[in-house]
């Protein structure tokens, strides 16, 4: 089950890094208090660090290590005119390879929710997190 697996990995990482766990706990408590002690959709939407923690969990432990897509049109690989992906061909996108690329994610083995903050995301191409 994808949700329980993601949450299990998030809890594992938080157990290893108590400072991150404390920061998340403080955000949860403050946000719930701000929403009159009601845990609602709007309350969850205000938990920005929670979103970062879950996104980093999905980055480090992707449920689908690969994505499969079908080419909608012929595509010539830039710089390689003999490499053509024909319309209808299946293409494998290596999710884990993208998420563990040190050029995009320095220290990819490190659990670091800050790399998925709003400011950090603005500096990165949108296809660098799948």
Show which residues each predicted segment covers.
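Cytochrome P450 catalytic-core helices
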Residues: 2-19, 23-27
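Amphipathic, well-packed alpha-helical segments that form the structural scaffold of globular domains
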Residues: 8, 25, 29, 55-62
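Long, K/E/R/D-enriched contiguous segments that form extended
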Residues: 9, 35-38
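A generic secondary-structure signal for well-formed alpha-helical elements
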Residues: 14-19, 28, 32-35, 61, ...
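Conserved cytochrome P450 K-helix E-x-x-R motif and the immediately C-terminal K′/meander segment
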Residues: 38-83, 102
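Conserved cytochrome P450 K-helix/beta-meander segment immediately N-terminal to the heme-binding cysteine loop
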Residues: 61, 93-123
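Cytochrome P450 heme-thiolate "Cys pocket" and heme-binding signature region
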Residues: 81, 118-130
């Amino acid at each position: 089950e994808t949700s329980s697996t993601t949450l299990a990995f998030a809890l594992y990482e938080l157990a290893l890094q108590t400072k991150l766990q404390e920061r998340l706990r403080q955000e949860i408590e403050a946000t719930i208090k701000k929403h009159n002690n009601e845990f609602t959709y709007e309350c969850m939407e205000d938990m920005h660090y929670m979103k970062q923690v879950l996104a980093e969990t999905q980055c480090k432990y992707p449920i689908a290590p690969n994505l499969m897509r079908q080419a909608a049109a012929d595509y010539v690989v830039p710089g390689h005119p003999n490499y053509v992906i024909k319309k209808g061909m299946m293409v494998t996108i290596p999710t884990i390879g993208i998420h563990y690329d040190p050029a995009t994610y320095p220290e990819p083995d490190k659990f670091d929710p800050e790399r998925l903050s709003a400011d950090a995301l603005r500096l990165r191409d949108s296809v660098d997190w799948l």
